[in-house]
Amino acid sequence: MKFVDEASILVVAGDGGNGCVSFRREKYIPKGGPDGGDGGDGGDVWMEADENLNTLIDYRFEKSFRAERGQNGASRDCTGKRGKDVTIKVPVGTRVIDQGTGETMGDMTKHGQRLLVAKGGWHGLGNTRFKSSVNRTPRQKTNGTPGDKRDLLLELMLLADVGMLGMPNAGKSTFIRAVSAAKPKVADYPFTTLVPSLGVVRMDSEKSFVVADIPGLIEGAAEGAGLGIRFLKHLERCRVLLHLIDIDPIDGSDPVENARIIIGELEKYSQDLAAKPRWLVFNKIDLMDKTEAEEKAKAIAEALGWEGKYYLISAASQLGVKDLCWDVMTFIIENPIAQAEEAKQPEKVEFMWDDYHRQQLAEVEEDADDDWDDDWDEDDEEGVEFIYKR
């Protein structure tokens, strides 16, 4: 199945049903009073995370989702039926962005998580709501309000513990094939990897972590060169980044300059991503003897001003790979995701008609107070003023 990590859709919630103007008329009850019911609320549009999905390709073809309108009110105080909700299923890891305002509505990070993205319109009020002591036959009603309408951008971001980045042909896909059951394509030409892939690294029966492989970066990726930097978003949720460096590039390029290009593109994309823990991993050490590889790796690290630990591996022959994986596993265990970060969600999204219903009822009560006349003044806005005399 084709991997699609972005899609734009239109969601429209259902309109609220209109209120009804009706009066009770039965035998022997000629003046039964108002009995018009309220309309029904419009249906909502929800997002739901589903772990069985892994792409947004369905929403490249189906782009519009509309919830059902609420039914109108009826006589005999019958309230209209509420409109049916619409649920849109997306892969776990999807971020929902309102393209109109630019706000992030939510991150779908857990299976079964639900997010309200468009709220249905409020129901209209029937004339029963407007009766008062001085207005026994109200002919007022209100119509239902329109439902929310939003243009949404869906961004699928892979959920992985470890992210891999580097130049094309640095050996990222070979590494993920060596440590997991994932089988990304491997070849001797640049940009063999065209889409991100995930692999589960099982250290033993109880310990494992997920690693993400993304297409390689080249100079100018931030301006769209190569495959650009749009795949870097898949590393935003990773806890540690493995920066793979080809210690002896076949094209004769300078490994130090290659590493600086990656760091520069990372900083152009996001300062937060550039600040994540990043480990240097020198790959393809099987192409030279051990002493030469160690000397070359040390020289590259010094040229980069690298003061931390670095690793020498050969993904093809799996030399040094197991030790690296155990160190990664230890780091993940010692640095669990903070509860505050895990529970972090965007601020509450405001919907169009959040306060409408409360305002409507307040206006009805206010009108009723205005209609009350205690006969202490000379003015009556409606009805007959009775003057009693002895």
UniProtKB/Swiss-Prot annotation:
Location in the cell: Cytoplasm
Comp. bias (Polar residues): 129-145
Gene Ontology terms: cellular component: cytoplasm
EC number: 3.6.5.-
Residues bound to Mg(2+): 173, 193
Keyword 4Fe-4S listed: no
Residue ranges of the region described as Disordered: 127-147
Required cofactor(s): Mg(2+)
UniProt cross-references to SUPFAM superfamilies, sorted A to Z: Obg GTP-binding protein N-terminal domain, P-loop containing nucleoside triphosphate hydrolases
UniProt cross-references to InterPro entries, sorted A to Z: G_OBG, GTP-bd, GTP-bd_Obg/CgtA, GTP1-OBG_CS, GTP1_OBG_dom, GTP1_OBG_dom_sf, OBG_GTPase, P-loop_NTPase
Domain OBG-type G: 160-333
One Pfam family named in its UniProt record: GTP1_OBG
Key words, A-Z: Cytoplasm, GTP-binding, Hydrolase, Magnesium, Metal-binding, Nucleotide-binding
Annotated binding of GTP, by residue: 166-173, 191-195, 213-216, 283-286, 314-316
GO molecular function: GTP binding; GTPase activity; magnesium ion binding
Single biological process term from Gene Ontology: ribosome biogenesis
Every Obg domain range: 1-159
Function, as annotated: An essential GTPase which binds GTP, GDP and possibly (p)ppGpp with moderate affinity, with high nucleotide exchange rates and a fairly low GTP hydrolysis rate. Plays a role in control of the cell cycle, stress response, ribosome biogenesis and in those bacteria that undergo differentiation, in morphogenesis control. Binds GDP with a dissociation constant of 1.7 uM and GTP with a dissociation constant of 6.5 uM.
Family under the similarity heading: Belongs to the TRAFAC class OBG-HflX-like GTPase superfamily. OBG GTPase family.
Assembly with partners or alone: Monomer. Binds RluD (AC P65836) as well as the 30S ribosomal subunit protein S9.
Protein's name in the database: GTPase Obg
The organism of origin for this protein: Salmonella typhimurium (strain LT2 / SGSC1412 / ATCC 700720)
